[in-house]
Amino acid sequence: MKQNKTKLVIAVLLIAFLFTGCIGVDRSFRNMRDYVLSYSGNEFEKEFEFSFGSISIGMAELVLDFAETEEPIDEILSEIDNVQVGIYNNLSSSKVKSSLEELKFITNKMESAGWDCIVRSVNKDEMTAIFLKYNEETLNQLFVISVNNDEVALVEILGNLNKVIEIAIREKGLDFAMKH
């Protein structure tokens, strides 16, 4: 009897580990990562790269149920299906190019894959771009690319982002603090 319980516990832990969604990023994310990193011509080292699926996000929601917060974090998380993040450190002695030319190449690549660019910024040694993708009328994907001399950061969020925006506006209104 005790041996069966031990096997059951091990099986449950193994299943929980395998299906939490905390795994490597998907092919489209890797393709964009490879494109951005190779364009600079520099050598990069992966600091971290991961993906949280719906089960991992659901587990985070359960933990947040016990946290005392007035923020609607659990409600927002319930609308998110997947989050992919990658941080890559520049190992080269040369600086990463953050130019308008590079931004145009990245934007063209993303637009050819069905993304709409909503923010593009090049400022001295830093470049940032934010892209959206829609499924019919619903905003369901957000992709952020940030490049500076030291690192490249990529973030992709999938889910019902219309609902996430609705929750944010409901809770905070349109009174967003702006840095001048």
PLM-predicted stretches and their roles:
Residues 131-162:
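A short, solvent-exposed beta-edge/loop patch
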Residues 104-132:
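Short Gly/Thr-rich strand-loop-strand
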Residues 163-180:
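A recognition module on extended beta-rich or small alphabeta surfaces enriched in W/G with H and D/E
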Residues 23-26:
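Bacterial signal peptide processing site
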Residues 2-10:
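Bacterial N-terminal signal peptides that target proteins for export
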Residues 18-21:
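C-terminal motif of bacterial Sec signal peptides marking the signal peptidase cleavage site
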Residues 28-102:
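Early exported N-terminus immediately downstream of N-terminal targeting peptides
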Residues 45-47, 78-82, 123-125, 138-140, ...:
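Extracytoplasmic
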